[in-house]
Amino acid sequence: MLSRILFFLIIISNTFSCQETKEKIPKPLNPNGDSELALLMRELQTNTSIIKNEIEKVNFDPSENSNNEYFAKLIESRHKLIEAEPSDKNLKSTNTYSNFVKMYNYSVSNFLNNNIKTNNYNNMINNCISCHQQFCLGTISTINKLKIK
């Protein structure tokens, strides 16, 4: 009787140990593919979040941080907004998008050239929200989290 139980346990353990485990592949954020502009926006969001954390530090010194790699990436990314290929080809069919990009670029310049103040940072974020109220509404809640209170 004991040998039957032992034999049965060995068979069960071998059955479960020999099964292949399927590797879970993460689903893409956009099942239709990610456009150049979408990827750039995600990069901007990541870098801006890091900049927000830098500004919120107690001993934040703008003169030290303005040369930070994330500030440099912000400058680099903002210049790519006009050329980046959007998911929706109609996005650039009018001047509306390019005007929003100009406003955003102005706010980034103002932020970086005026001692990196909180109100200039929040103005930059508000320009993001203004554009996203016209295009891609779903990200506004994420952008709002970038504001400094």
Each PLM stretch: what is its role?
Residues I5-S13:
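Sec-dependent N-terminal signal peptides
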